[in-house]
Amino acid sequence: MDEQKRLLLAVLLSVVVLVGYQFFFTTPPADRNLPQNTQKAPDQARQPATGDNQSTVSDYNRADQGLPAPSPQPSTADFRTISVSTPLYNIAISEYLAAVTSQSLKKYKSSNGSSTDLKQMVDPRLSRGTLITGTQGGTIQGLDNAVFTADTDTTNLTLAQGEKAVAFSWTSPHGITVKKIYRFQADSYLIDCDIVIQNGSGMPLNDALVITTPGIFDEETKKRSRFAFQGPVAYIGNEYLTIKPKDIEDQDTFTGQVDWTGYTDRYFLTAVLPQKSGDAHLKLQYENEIAESRLVWRMDRLDPEKQGEYAFVYYMGPKSHKVLSQYD
């Protein structure tokens, strides 16, 4: 896929600029130990849900889809956590916000001195997790505290080969349905995520999606960041950006062609990659020792009985030339 290839190449080039050497807490596995299927050509990967020249909006009819009328939402205490285990990682997604609350990398160790603890990509102090979806204008009432429902009866899934999809859905009190469809690949750190908005209300919806990747930036992180950058990162307008949290007060918005946004520590990266070009920008926030990188993606106007589909790719893995080059 040319578009995905271009985006991933941008990630790779920016990592090469940032990291001039590869050093991990444990010796990375040799190339021969990496899954061979990761060498597949990009055009063999799953195609985006919509093409660059196609509208993201289509007809949607509640009656045709057999969807029930909106019902009272469950308490935020009534939710499950869906775990998926692949050869590369263990990931946990909560039905609360349909956000990623944990991801441990099986091939990398933690920096806490333990020889057994795996690298954890989501700091446990991030109570809402990461890759959180919201709207800029708050027009989908309740989304910021939503409890989704996953389309699986079991909470523990194993993926040894191929790919597996898990869909999370939620309907607002006004009849707007939000779906987050995660697609995991056994041999890749890439996770496809399609976000579908179905307007079952009686009013048009005109807003922007916001996907947030937060990170802890406390005094200890500040000390480590003196030697290798940690914090919000992005690739915008063919330029690799590293934004120090202390500078966010001076500039919290970056515009231009957004290839990806995310958050990095010294050796690992969490990134959001749109699968097509669109009206987007980066919005940053830093407070209470949490720095947030937010991809703001303008949605097409959704009239009643219309739906919009927006395709993204998430990357949660090593900031390694060796690994990222497999996705060129």
PLM regions and their residue ranges:
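Membrane-protein biogenesis/insertion across secretory and organellar systems
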Residues: 1-328
